[in-house]
Regions:
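Short, surface-exposed coil-to-beta transition loops
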Residues: 28-30, 88-93, 115-120
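Beta-strand/loop substructures that line and gate deep hydrophobic ligand-binding cavities in soluble
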Residues: 96-97, 103-164, 169-171
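Hydrophobic ligand-binding cavity/cleft-lining segments
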Residues: 3-73
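Short, highly charged C-terminal tails/helix-capping segments
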Residues: 66-67, 170-175
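A generic structural micro-feature
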Residues: 23-25, 72, 85-87, 112-116, ...
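Short beta-strand segments that buttress and anchor functional surface loops
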Residues: 77-85, 105-111
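Flexible, solvent-exposed loop/hinge segments and secondary-structure transition points
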Residues: 69-76, 97-99
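Extracytoplasmic/secreted envelope proteins and their assembly/folding machinery
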Residues: 39, 46-52, 92, 121, ...
Length: 175
């Protein structure tokens, strides 16, 4: 009886591991909001890391988080590094491309609570009196993330933060 239960458990574990291994190697999380403001109003809030505390949902994860700004004041070459509690972790982001009022691209490197290297794009598209702002993050998904993804939806977790950040950008830009 014990050996039958053990075999069944091993088969279930093997099936879960095999299923996790077949999941996509890369991920993309994207959210979009329409803001009643021109791109010229929204763009500086994204392109200048010193303004991120006014809208980024990640700024509230740890009120004692240590932040370091270096490189350019804004735009390409601007760097933001942080180190905080278990929720905020430790990492660094750098603006690698900045096209006035239309695109900000970041290289995002996490050190803690896990290592990850992602790319982030903020795309601003004007349409009449409105601007469509898209926040997208792309990266590779190591096996452990594939396995965890069987039990939690990372798109929902990360997407929720993006939605809060975009709502904050909307509030600031429409004021």
């Amino acid at each position: 009886m014990f050996s039958t239960i053990l075999i069944i458990l091993l088969v279930i574990i093997a099936a879960v591991l095999i299923h996790a291994a077949t999941r996509p190697n890369d991920f993309v999380t994207t959210r979009t909001a329409t803001i009643k403001a021109p791109p010229e109003v929204i763009f500086p809030l994204i392109n200048d890391f010193s303004r991120w505390p006014t809208w980024s949902p990640y700024e509230k994860l740890d009120p004692n988080m240590k932040r370091t700004l270096s490189g350019a004041q804004s735009g390409k070459g601007a760097v933001y590094a942080w180190e905080g509690n278990g929720k905020a972790g430790k990492g660094r982001m750098e603006i690698v491309n900045s096209v006035a009022s239309s695109l900000v691209s970041l290289k995002l490197d996490f050190e803690k609570p896990f290592r990850a290297n992602n790319s982030v794009d903020f795309t601003l598209t004007p349409s009449g009196d409105d601007t469509s702002v898209t926040w997208a993050m792309r990266g590779s998904r190591p096996f452990i993330a594939k396995l965890m993804g069987l039990f939690m939806n990372f798109d929902t977790l990360i997407g929720r933060d993006f939605e809060v950040g975009l709502a904050n950008l909307k509030r600031l830009s429409e004021a």
